[in-house]
Amino acid sequence: MIARLLILIARAWQLGPSRVLPPTCRYAPSCSEYAIVALRRHGAIKGGWIATKRLLRCHPWGGHGYDPVP
């Protein structure tokens, strides 16, 4: 249930502010898509933690390129 709510929030981001703002994600798939896959695959707690770690890595001095969900 919590995972679905978090997925809904990520989806709202994709359909709302993300379409207006310039793309800034350094990774593929995008951070929001990565979060959705992580939440579906691992659930709210573990998937949320995986998504949070990805968001913390997404900055100008972080990595880049293809980064699949474990």
Curated annotation (Swiss-Prot):
Topology of this chain in the membrane: Peripheral membrane protein
Keyword Cell membrane found: yes
Highest taxon listed in the record's lineage: Bacteria
Signal peptide, first to last residue: none
GO cellular component terms, semicolon-separated: plasma membrane
Family label: Belongs to the UPF0161 family.
Physiological role: Could be involved in insertion of integral membrane proteins into the membrane.
Xref: NCBIfam families: membrane protein insertion efficiency factor YidD (TIGR00278)
Protein name stated in the entry: Putative membrane protein insertion efficiency factor
UniProt source species: Sphingopyxis alaskensis (strain DSM 13593 / LMG 18877 / RB2256)
